[in-house]
């Protein structure tokens, strides 16, 4: 019985080892001839619009917001390694024709083009979708404790968030976004009361970990004041999507801050 158990464990470890090295194995044993035939500019078979530019180990897309992706061909399958790894079954490949099946099961037909003017579609690539975007809100607030000057400023950081989506051919592609930092400065008659730079990680006790990993701090703004405090909303959400969490910040005139989920 012990011998069978040991053998079973060894088999499982061997299978796990094979799975862990499968990507590296595929790359080292890739179909170099198929890869060479893919080099160049490809257009959609139906309308001749530029679809992708293959150069070396990378595929570039005409949408300037889409990140280039590494690729290889192994056993008649085109593998794309972006945020996620996907394989697309090649149905037919010739020097000027490529047919493969996308993730929806639809056939994609691409034709190689020698039109050099189409290369301009691949000449520009943005670093991130929201690079250099800033938001500011300066507000004078009247309360029972006097006037407060609220300064909110939101700007991008160097922290990257990758969001996967699908292009017109049903192929998964990646867009890169930069996370934001929200700065709050609160003064009472010119005297500093509260100052802090907020990042999304500070709200991990209120937001699921997986969601927080895929999201950015999108907005922060003043909402209202009462006799005891000033209130702000912080919006954390998936880039370019409606899915968000809203956190309410409560700042008292003596500089104490608390937060809760709306």
Report residues per predicted region.
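Acidic, glycine-rich flexible loop segments
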Residues: 206-239
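Surface-exposed beta-loop interaction hotspot
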Residues: 106-165
């Amino acid at each position: 019985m012990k011998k069978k158990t040991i053998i079973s464990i060894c088999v499982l470890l061997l299978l796990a080892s094979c799975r862990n090295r499968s990507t590296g194995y595929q790359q080292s044993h890739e179909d170099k001839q198929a890869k060479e035939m893919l080099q160049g500019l490809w257009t959609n078979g139906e309308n001749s619009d530029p679809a992708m530019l293959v150069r070396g180990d990378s595929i570039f897309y005409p949408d300037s917001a889409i990140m280039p992706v590494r690729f290889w061909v192994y056993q008649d399958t085109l593998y794309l390694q972006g945020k996620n790894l996907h394989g697309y079954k090649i149905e037919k490949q010739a020097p000027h024709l490529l047919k493969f099946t996308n993730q929806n099961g639809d056939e994609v037909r691409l034709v190689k083009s020698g039109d050099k003017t189409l290369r301009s579609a691949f000449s520009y690539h943005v670093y991130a979708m929201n690079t250099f975007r800033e938001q500011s809100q300066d507000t004078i607030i009247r309360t029972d404790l006097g006037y407060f000057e609220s300064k909110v400023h939101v700007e991008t950081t160097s922290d990257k968030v990758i969001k996967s989506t699908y292009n017109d051919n049903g192929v998964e592609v990646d867009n890169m976004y930069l996370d934001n930092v929200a700065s709050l400065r609160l003064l009472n008659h010119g005297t500093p009361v509260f100052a802090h730079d907020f990042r999304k990680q500070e709200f991990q006790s209120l937001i699921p970990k997986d969601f927080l990993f895929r999201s950015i701090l999108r907005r922060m703004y003043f909402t209202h004041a009462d006799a005891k405090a000033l209130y702000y909303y912080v919006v954390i959400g998936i880039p370019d999507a409606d899915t968000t969490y809203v956190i309410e910040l409560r700042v008292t005139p003596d500089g104490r801050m608390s937060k809760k989920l709306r």
